[in-house]
Every structure is written in C-alpha cells, then in structure tokens.
Curated annotation (Swiss-Prot):
Keyword set, alphabetical order: Endoplasmic reticulum, ER-Golgi transport, Golgi apparatus, Membrane, Peroxisome biogenesis, Phosphoprotein, Protein transport, Transport
Chief localisation class: endoplasmic reticulum
Assembly behavior: SEC16A and SEC16B are each present in multiple copies in a heteromeric complex. Interacts with TFG. Interacts with SEC13.
Spans annotated as Disordered: 1-86, 185-220, 704-778, 849-1057
Membrane topology type: Peripheral membrane protein
Compositional bias ranges of the Acidic residues kind: 927-938
Family: Belongs to the SEC16 family.
Reported function: Plays a role in the organization of the endoplasmic reticulum exit sites (ERES), also known as transitional endoplasmic reticulum (tER). Required for secretory cargo traffic from the endoplasmic reticulum to the Golgi apparatus. Involved in peroxisome biogenesis. Regulates the transport of peroxisomal biogenesis factors PEX3 and PEX16 from the ER to peroxisomes.
Biased composition (Polar residues): 1-15, 201-213, 737-764, 1028-1043
Gene name as annotated: Sec16b
Organism field: Rattus norvegicus
Protein name (database record): Protein transport protein Sec16B
Highest classification ranks of the organism: Eukaryota, Metazoa, Chordata, Craniata, Vertebrata
Keyword set includes Endoplasmic reticulum: yes
Tissue: Liver, kidney, heart, spleen and brain.
Length: 1057
C-alpha cells in the first residue's frame, strides 16, 4: 500500500489542472476532508515522484476521507480518534497583542463536534495554493490579524458528507457553510482570486514537524465547551460582503507593513453603557454604531420614578425634612411623630412599646418647645402602667431589734401557738396599741417603745421618736421601715434615693422579676430634690442597665432624661449617637433612616427653645441622609439638607471639621443646579453659587490655611495684633481649644508653623520662645499675666552688649517693630518679692560686665539643648568659633567659655543631674555666680549688687497655657529699634525687652538696629535639640509672692514680673 506523502516545504509544482479540478496526468488527487483542514494542512504528492512513504505526524488521528481506489487499503478512523481530532490544541489568546508573530490555527468546523449539526458548520479549507483569503473572518486567523482569508472553494459541497463522483476524474463533497455557498463553484467556474502566487505570510507558516493540534490541545487543557466560547469572543465579526471580497487583493501594502500589536477590546459583546447623574438621573447609551449609520441613542431616566415603589424612598418622602425652625411648623412634626407611634404600637414587636414611647416623648418635647418637666414625663411614663399588678410586700427576714429569727406578729393571728401551746390574746385595737406605746414611754423605756411601735407598724410614732434620739437609732428605724416594702416597689426606689444611695432598681430593672422600669423612672423624675448629681447618676445607671439587656430604646429614653450629650459612632464608650439606635452594631444597621429622622426631630425640638442649639456630632449623619436622598432621586430635598447643614456648620465657629466641610461642598456642588433660583441666576456660561455655599468655601479655605500656617501675615507683629485687639490673648486660642484633634498628631503639628513657613529668617536653637507676658512700666498699667503661646513666631527683643570705654558702657535693647520701649522700662533693681532671675555676669578685664542671656523656657514636649550635654558643649564651641568671624566681643567669648566649663563638669545622669550635682566653683569668674550658688543660705531673694547688671525679664507663662507641639526651633525676629540705657555710677546700663526675649550674645547691634539687615547665621548647624528641664516653667505665676523652694530657686531660677 502506498500512502500519500506530504510535501515538506513549498508548493508542489504538479501538472496543470483544468477548471473541473482533474489532474491531467491521469492520477486522482483527493482533497482532504474539512476536518483535517487548517493552518497545518497536508499537501499530497504523486506516488510516482516519491515511492518512499513518509509518516505523517498526524496519521494516528487525522486520515483523509476519499473514495478508495482498487488495490488500495486504508485503515478506518475509529470513533474515539475521530472525536479527539476534532478540536484544535492551541489555547485561546489575544490576537496580535501577546505574540504578534504567532500563527493561530483555524478552528475545525463544528459539524464534527459531538453535538452534530446543532452548531454552525465552519469553512473547509483548501491546500495552500488554492485558498482565497477572506478579510475580517472571525474563524480564520493568520499572522496579521487584518489579513483574513476566506475560501471560495466551499461552493462545491452538497448536502451530504459522502463524495459523489461526477466523472472518472472529479469528485465533490458537501459544504454546509451558508456564507460561502455560491453556484459558480458548482459548475466548475473559477472564483475571483483563486490562483495567486504565494505570499510571505504563507511561506512563514509552521512546517509539519511542528507540534500537532491534538498535542497542543492536550497540553493546554482547553475543553470543547471553552473552545466554543472562545470562538464567540473574537473581535467584532463583520458580515460577509461580496463587493468587498471581489475588490480585495491578496497582497496589500498596508497590511504587510502593519505588524504593530493591538490590544483587544474590553468588551466583545455590544452592551449598554449607564451612568448616574448628579440630579437624580440615570443616563443610558444604547449600543448603536454611528459609524455604520446608526444614530446614537441616549436615554435619560429619573431615579425618583424608577425607585418609586421602594420602601426607603417612601419613608424619606413622608418625612418633612430638613427641619428648619423658620420653615417647618411644629404641628407637622407632631403629626408625623404620632403616626410613627401608632405604627409602633400596631407592630407588637418586643421593642415596639419602647419605640412608641420615644415617638411620644418627641411629641411632648415639640409641644413644650424642647423643655423637659419631670411631672410631665412621669405622666407620659405612667400612661400604660395603670393595669399593672400590685406590688407584694415581702415579710421581714429577722427582727431588727434583737436580731433573732422571731417574726413579728401578724395582726390577724388568733390561733394556738404550736410551740408553746398558748393561745394568744385577742388582737389589740389601734387605740390599745397606742396606749401601750404611751405607757412604755411613761416609764422611760424608749427602746421597748420603739420595738412595740415597729412590731405593730406604728412607723410614724417610731420614726418621730427615733429622730429625737441618736442618728444610729434613727437609721435603724428607717432601715426597718424600708425593708417592709417590696424590692421592686417604686417607694423603695424613692426612699433609697432620698437616703443618698443609688436605688437598687437602677441596677436590677429590666428583668421579669422586677417588672416594668417606667414607674421607677417616673418616681425619680417627679421627686427631684437635693443632690441633682445623684439623681442624674441614678438615671444614667438605669439606662446602662437597660442597654446591657438589649432595651436600646428604653435606655436612650433614660439618657435623654439625664441630658447625656451625643457621642460618636467610633467611640463605643459613648452612651448614644443616634436616638433609638445602638452604635455597637455595624454601621449600616446603626445609621438607619428612622434613627436619623428621630435624632433630627430631637434637634429641632431643642432649637425651638434655643435657636442655635445644633448637635455637632449629628451633622455628619444629616449629610449621609442627604446623600441617600440624592441616590433615590430626591435632588432638591437633598440640596435643602446641604443648606441646613451649612447653616449649622457656619454657626459653630472654629470647631468645624475640615473633612465634613469638604464633603459637604462636594455634594452641594453636584446638587446646586437642582435649585431653580440658581438656574435663573445664570449669567451666560457662569453659574452663580448661593451665598451659603460661598461662605462654606471661604470657611474651608480658612481652616486649610490655619492648618498649614498660611493665615499668618508676616508683616504684622504680635504687638500690632494685640494692640489692635486690646488684649494679650492669641487670636487662635479658641481654635485650638475647641477642635477635637488631640488624637491626630498630624493635624496638631500642622496647626503650628514650622521654620520654613515663617517669614523670619535664621532660626537659632538657643532661642525657642513661647509667648511671654508683656512687661509694662508702672505708667502703662499693671502687668498682663498668662498670655498663651501664639501659632506663629514672635519677633524677639534682643539684648546686645555695646562695647565702650572703660569708664562707661551700655546695654542696647532691641524691641520688636511697633513695640513700646521707654527709659522708664529700664529697671535697675527689681522689687523685693518678685520672680527675679539672678544673671550670670562675667567681669571683663576692661571693666565691662557681660550679662548672659537667660534661657527662656520651652513649652512641654519641646526639646532644646541641654546644658549638661557634651554634644551641646562641643557645638557651642563650634558656634563660638563661627561667631569669631563677626565683630568680636571678648565678653561674649568669655561667656561661652563659662558655659563650656559648666558643661564639661556635668555628670552623666542626664537632666536629673540638675538635682544631684552642683556646678564647680572653679568656673565662676564673677561674684554674681558665687551669689547664685550661695542662694541656699539666703532666706529671701535679694537684689543684685550695684556693680552687676540685672535685667527685668518677662516671667515664664503659666502652666495652664497651651503648649507648643511639634516645634523645636523658632526663627528670630529682626529688631527695628535700639535703645541705649542710661549709665549708672558703675558704668552699666540696664534694659528690658518688650517681648521678654533676649537676643544672642556676642553679636553686633547693627544687625538688630537696622530693619533690613539680616541676623547672623545660627551657631549650630543640624544639631538635634535635647530636652532641657530648666526651660520648662516650674511654678505658676500665682505663687510668685511665696518663697520658692531653695533647690528650685537655685537650679530653676524664676523670671521677674
């Protein structure tokens, strides 16, 4: 048997064929079955040219079906192999994108699938030389995705799959392709473009030695169903057009050069594109193609109409919000609350009775303009408690007098005593009982009289008698009286509360044994007298007990009666965040529409009595409610809510949250066109925003500038600001005190400007200056105390030493621009009893006393340069050497040496060494240092000697002043004025700076006397400031008149007033 041997490469140059496809050499050349057609096709050679059979790699599964000739035998294809060979093995991939040079195998026709003729039967393929490509076919992919091939030879096939011999040299097979059926092929006519030379794409096809389809399919694991699905996920298929194929040429210049990979489309199936508009619209775009002549269809639907039947939308439409005091009448609110209460009573759920009580409370508050009267609330509580059972008294457990187990006699007892056998006497009448009580008192037996009165329930006589005796006896009789009452009796609750104790009902209510909680709360609210805090704690305890047992509405009723403020959802320790909703559950179940509406009505009731009494933490839930209104298509009502929230935020002042402002502005920006007034006020393309939205933008901008520190004007000094205000308070004191951002360190640090944000230049680590108290002369008035730290740096008043002759010298005081500096502010000797600062003065060889600058205290959490740090001492030396380039001052250099000497002598205990060690006396070069060290032996502060210079500096701020977080260094202020002090007998001048800040020593005064001159560079570059306890205020200003502690006075000298 001779087999058809496939040609390894190229196209067989066989004899020419006629139009009826018969071989002129007399041999039949059968055409392969469509099942075995594909990119890896077979070309069969004549047996005369190659007598050696060549094994086809796919002979095991793919054998050609043709009419056998006599003398030839071919093995039939088994059913399993027939089905296995029906699927290609190449996995589906994005054509032209992942591998532009990968050849994609043409899928086998679906007439060979297991489902038979259910699917569309694909194109049978011809040998390589006889195929006509079709452009845009979704079933045939080649190297170039646009170079699609279609076949015109499919028109030979008839309606059965067997071959029909038309003559001795021709045969036909059936085609089931509805796209390519053409009667021209039935008559043997040539198709357009049937014969054409080989293109470059065909020459680059893989040879027969490549991996077969079956093997690739087996390796990829692609099933038949997934492969079928991949055929529909091709890029947009186009209908076959005969006019296009007739004019198409096999080789196109554009197609051969276009090898750039293209990303596949995101959607393979036409779909509808939808979007939600800000005004409650739903925009739908139909999948039409305007390029094909189809008009673009855009549909606009109203969400209010679409969601008309939803329960949430009906609930929000029925609510008359937003509740503004000037727009909504309270009768409408009362009617709404009464309907809600009636619905809760009809539902008969476990918490429906308590929920109805909340709605009835809102009706009462709305009627009384938000005021709560205890008797009215008690009447509301007792409306449903009239049919309750009577409280049963409990019998006494023991005799309170002799503490025995003997029970008190019952008044109606007249039977025989089983223990003694005695028959008791007849029951005494009330008159006889009182007479016996009186007879006992005749003989002075008060204890027996009390026993008799308590046994016979003469509690009035017993309590009055006990009240005139000692307090222990009175408490004993009171306890005996209260124990006769039932534990769940409201009288028991009241008596325990009047006795100064939290009643037992406050911690046990809510159980079935205790019965209803309402009478207990009613008796507490109706009899509030004495300690109001005790009553409030009792009501809050009752609310906590009810909340612990799952009665959320009942607990919130108690919280509202106790005036508990509203909390936040994230803080689980808060008592309530929304009225009637438990904030310990998930947010969607917590922030319900009904809970938000109840809370808004409660806020409205409060505003009836106090117009500006908004609930700050509730504004974010109103914004959430407005967003839900917009989602359900109620855009105009949502815009009104934004306006109401904006009014509440603007009335809060500086305590507004910037995130809430930003989200409110975003929502209002989307909904502003829903206001007809805004549409009418349009001027061309510009839409005028409402005034409240403009104010919100301005307020949000101010908050952002305050956070970044840009609000400060660099041209204004603190003295100018304070002079205009007439006070020494900082303008941002309320902003920092009211905003609850203590936990947000990032925001807190942003409130304070850094050195880069300030306009002043050259910060120095030695000059961290919180705002000091201004020092005024006696003529200007008393000293202003306790000025807090500002949000910006204060230009310092610098003290410089002016070198002069040996007979006289002066100290220059440089003040801030606009500051008041006078000669009367130069204090030579501070008064006794003031917080004076003993200054360290170093005697110059020329007779000039150098005054060291006092270290101004830092606020807590700030770190400065510790005087006992070796790093600080080393860097001070470097700073001194750097300062030598400036105009030299021997006194300043000597002062730095003095500081270095102190630093080298310090111990290794850190800042605690201030308490443990004393500075060495060897480094003291002046008598003033000795006088400071010897202050332990002094009983009171004394004035400095006349030959030493003493400065009246500003005292430290009180401990209650706000701290300065996140700041370690501050810039120095440039001085604008220089003042020469008058010389005294010793040739020294004394001066005080306005701001109470001393400037750097050893620097020429020309840097501070000229406003335009820049101060010298900082002495320390890149140093890490350390914590210095000497710069922390130790004592408040109020204790300045008291004698300070010796150790504190010696180590932490206080500042003078």
């Amino acid at each position: 048997m001779e087999l058809w041997v496939p040609q390894t490469q190229g196209r067989t140059t066989g004899p020419s064929r006629d139009a009826n496809r018969r071989l002129q050499s007399g041999h039949y050349r059968p055409r392969p079955h469509p099942q075995y057609s594909g990119d890896n096709y077979h070309q069969w050679q004549d047996t005369h040219k190659n007598s050696k059979p060549q094994q086809d790699p796919r002979d095991d599964h793919q054998q050609p079906h043709y009419v056998p000739r006599s003398g030839e035998w071919s093995q039939p294809v088994s059913g399993a192999d027939y089905l296995k060979g029906s699927y290609p093995s190449h996995p589906y991939s994005r054509s032209g994108y992942e591998d532009p040079y990968q050849s994609y195998h043409t899928p086998t026709p679906r007439d060979e699938y297991a489902y038979g003729n259910y699917y569309y039967h694909g194109h049978p393929q011809l040998p390589q030389g006889e195929r006509v490509a079709r452009q845009g076919s979704p079933y045939i992919w080649h190297e170039d995705h646009r170079d699609q091939r279609h076949f015109s030879e499919h028109h030979w096939e008839k309606h059965n799959s067997t071959f029909e011999a038309n003559s001795d040299t021709q045969f036909q097979f059936t085609s089931k392709n509805p796209y390519n059926d053409n009667p021209a092929s039935a008559f043997g006519l040539e198709q357009p473009g049937e014969f054409f030379p080989e293109s470059g794409a065909q020459k680059q096809k893989p040879s027969l030695t490549s991996k077969s389809n079956l093997l690739q399919q087996h390796e990829s694991g692609l099933s038949s169903s997934s492969y079928e699905l991949s055929q529909y996920m091709t890029e947009a298929p186009e209908q076959y057009e005969p006019m296009v194929s007739a004019t198409w040429r096999p080789i196109q210049a554009d197609d051969t050069s276009a090898t750039v990979p293209k990303a596949p489309m995101r959607f393979y199936v036409p779909h509808v594109s939808v979007s939600f508009g800000p005004g409650g619209q739903l925009i739908c775009v139909s999948p039409n193609s305007p390029a094909d002549g189809q008009t673009a269809l855009v549909e606009v639907h109203s969400m209010e109409v679409i969601l008309n039947d939803f329960e949430d939308q009906e609930e929000m439409r029925a609510f008359p919000g937003p509740l503004i005091r000037e727009d909504i009448h309270k009768v409408d609110i009362m009617t709404f609350c009464q309907k809600k209460a009636a619905q809760c009573l009809k539902s008969e759920t476990p918490g429906s009775r308590d929920s109805a009580l909340l709605w009835q409370l809102l009706v009462l508050l709305c009627r009384q303009n938000g005021s709560m009267v205890g008797s009215d609330i008690a009447e509301l509580l007792m409306q449903d408690c009239k049919k309750l059972e009577k409280y049963k008294r409990q019998p006494p457990v023991a005799n309170l007098i002799n503490l025995t187990d003997e029970d008190w006699p019952v008044l109606s007892s007249g039977t025989r005593n089983l223990l003694t056998g005695e028959i008791p006497l007849n029951v005494d009448t009330p008159a006889q009982i009182v007479e016996k009580f009186t007879n006992l008192l005749y003989y002075g037996r008060k204890k027996e009289a009390l026993e008799w009165a308590m046994k016979n329930h003469l509690w009035g006589h017993a309590l009055f008698l006990a009240s005139k005796m000692d307090p222990r006896t009175y408490n004993w009789v009171m306890s005996g009286f209260t124990t006769t009452l039932a534990l769940n009796d409201p009288l028991q609750t009241l008596f325990q509360l009047m006795s100064g104790r939290i009643p037992q009902a406050a911690t046990c209510c809510g159980d079935k044994q205790w019965g209803d909680w309402r009478p207990h709360l009613a008796v507490i609210l109706s009899n509030q007298a004495g300690d109001a805090e005790l009553y409030q704690r009792a009501i809050v305890s009752m609310g906590d007990t009810l909340a612990g047992k799952g009665l959320v509405e009942a607990s919130h009723f108690c919280y509202l009666m106790a005036h508990v403020p509203f909390g936040h959802y994230t803080v689980k320790t808060d008592h309530l965040a929304l009225v009637g909703s438990n904030h310990s559950q998930e947010f969607l179940k917590f922030a319900t529409i009904e809970a938000i509406q109840r809370t808004e009505i409660f806020e409205y009731c409060q505003m009836l009595g106090r117009p500006k009494s908004f609930i700050p933490s509730f504004q974010v839930y109103k914004l959430l409610y407005a967003s839900r209104l917009a989602d359900y298509g109620l855009a105009s009502q949502a815009l009104h809510y934004c306006e109401a929230i904006g009014a509440a935020v603007l009335s809060e002042g500086g305590s507004s949250h910037p995130v809430l402002l930003a989200e409110l502005i975003k929502l209002a920006e989307k909904l502003k066109l829903s206001d007809p007034l805004v549409l009418e006020s349009r001027r061309g393309d510009r839409v005028l925003e409402p005034d409240w939205l403009v104010q919100l933008r301005r307020k949000h901008k101010e908050l952002e500038q305050t956070r970044t520190g840009d609000l400060r004007d660099p041209d204004l000094t603190p003295s100018d600001i304070y002079g205009a205000r007439g006070t020494t308070d900082t303008p941002y004191r309320d902003l920092y005190g009211q905003q609850n951002y203590s936990e947000d360190s990032e925001y807190s640090s942003a409130l304070w400007p850094t050195s880069e944000q300030t306009s002043l230049t050259n910060p120095t680590p030695q000059q961290p200056f919180p705002l000091q108290r201004d020092t005024y002369s006696e003529r200007d008035g008393p000293v202003h105390m306790g000025t807090p730290v500002p949000l910006y740096s204060v230009p310092a008043t610098h003290l410089t030493v002016i070198s002069g002759s040996s007979s006289g010298s002066g100290v220059a005081v440089t003040g801030a621009p606009g500051g008041r500096v006078g000669e009367e502010m130069l204090q030579k000797h501070p008064a006794l009893g003031e917080n004076t600062v003993p200054q360290e003065a170093v005697q110059d060889p020329d007779g000039l006393a150098v005054i060291s600058s006092p270290q101004t205290p830092l606020a807590p959490r700030d770190r400065s340069f510790s005087e006992d740090s070796a790093i600080s001492a080393k860097e001070d030396e470097e700073g001194t050497s750097d300062g030598a380039d400036k105009p030299p001052h021997p006194d300043a250099s000597q002062k730095e040496k003095l500081r270095d000497g102190k630093n080298t002598k310090s111990s290794g205990f850190g800042w605690f060494s201030w308490f443990r060690s004393k500075p060495a006396s060897s480094v003291s070069t002046s008598g003033d240092e000795d006088s400071v060290d010897s202050s332990d032996s002094e009983e009171s502060p004394r004035a400095s000697p006349p030959h030493h210079a003493s400065l009246g500096l500003s005292p430290t701020p009180p401990l209650s002043s706000p701290s300065l977080p996140g700041a370690s260094t501050f810039p120095r202020g440039t001085g604008g004025n220089s003042l020469q002090g008058s010389s005294n007998s010793s040739g020294m001048a004394e001066g005080v700076g306005i701001g109470g800040f001393s400037g750097p020593q050893g620097v020429s005064s020309e840097f501070y006397s000229q406003p335009g001159a820049l101060p010298p560079p900082p002495t320390l570059q890149g140093a890490v400031p350390l914590y210095n306890p000497s710069q922390v205020p130790q004592l408040p200003t109020a204790s300045s008149l008291n004698r300070p502690n010796r150790l504190a006075q010696r180590r932490y000298p206080s500042q003078p007033c």
